[in-house]
């Protein structure tokens, strides 16, 4: 409990209690904190004290506030090698976490000109458009839109399901293994659709990654657009000294 007789300000004492609870797992990543009023009652302090402690913890990266929803424990940022070839499922397994993805939709559509150019196919050729949300624990990490050429992967839409690795489908069903890719990285701002799927505010900064994957003979096999909240991932680049 808080010590009113201590020379340490009450808000700092409260900060320490909350950070200790986070480290001990009392509040797990993405967990919602009690409301300001509930914390006031629990620790017998003013709302100003609670608010100061919460704001400091937000600035220090322990918590995140979502307008109209409350205050949540922030998941540690994932570190992702920008030029990595492995897919989401392989990456999550390499960190000791279980992959979790949710399929929003998958449809057969005619390829637009930009998609056709990336996949080196004719415009209007049939492609499967897959939209998914990829998670880190229970927090949305990535909103993904991927296109697969149907002529190269006939029937691929029948294998798509929640929890299924698309790289595994390519390897097991079509004997195709991506060996390298190109990526374009930009920063954009969340619109209504991204805000909904990534559980963030409209206007939040997002990483936008435009990726095309290739086989060893440079044949494009899919192209993806990934949107990721900048607070949830850090990208690294390992390169030889030149």
UniProtKB/Swiss-Prot annotation:
Domain HTH gntR-type: 8-76
DNA-binding region: 36-55
Record's keyword annotation contains Transcription regulation: yes
Keyword Transcription belongs to the record: yes
CDD domains assigned: WHTH_GntR (cd07377)
InterPro entries: Bact_HTH_transcr_reg, Chorismate_lyase_/UTRA_dom_sf, Tscrpt_reg_HTH_GntR, UTRA, WH-like_DNA-bd_sf, WH_DNA-bd_sf
GO biological process: negative regulation of DNA-templated transcription
One Gene Ontology term of the molecular function aspect: DNA-binding transcription factor activity
Alphabetical UniProt keywords: DNA-binding, Transcription, Transcription regulation
UniProt cross-references to NCBIfam families, sorted A to Z: PRK11402.1
The protein's name in its UniProt record: Uncharacterized HTH-type transcriptional regulator YurK
Organism whose genome encodes this protein: Bacillus subtilis (strain 168)
């Amino acid at each position: 409990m808080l010590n009113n007789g201590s020379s340490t300000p009450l808000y700092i004492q409260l900060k320490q209690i909350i950070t200790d609870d986070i480290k001990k797992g009392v509040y797990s990543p993405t967990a919602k904190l009690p409301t300001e009023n509930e914390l006031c009652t629990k620790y017998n302090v003013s709302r100003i004290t609670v608010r100061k402690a919460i704001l400091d913890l937000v600035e220090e990266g322990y918590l995140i506030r979502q307008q109209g929803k409350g205050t949540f424990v922030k998941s540690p940022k994932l570190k992702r090698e920008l030029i990595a070839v492995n897919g989401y499922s392989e990456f999550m397994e390499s960190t000791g976490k279980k992959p979790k993805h949710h399929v929003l939709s998958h449809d057969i559509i005619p390829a637009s000109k930009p998609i056709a150019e990336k996949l080196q196919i004719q415009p209007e050729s049939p492609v499967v458009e897959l939209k998914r949300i990829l998670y880190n624990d229970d927090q949305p990490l990535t909103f993904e839109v991927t296109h697969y050429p149907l002529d190269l992967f006939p029937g691929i839409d029948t294998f798509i399901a929640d929890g299924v690795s698309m790289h595994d489908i390519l390897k097991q069903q079509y004997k195709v293994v991506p060996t390298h890719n190109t990526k374009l990285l930009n920063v954009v701002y969340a619109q209504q659709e991204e805000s909904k799927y990534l559980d963030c505010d409209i206007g939040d900064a997002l990483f936008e990654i435009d990726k095309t994957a290739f086989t060893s003979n440079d044949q494009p096999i899919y192209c993806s657009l990934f949107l990721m909240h900048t607070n949830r991932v850090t990208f690294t680049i390992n390169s030889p000294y030149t």
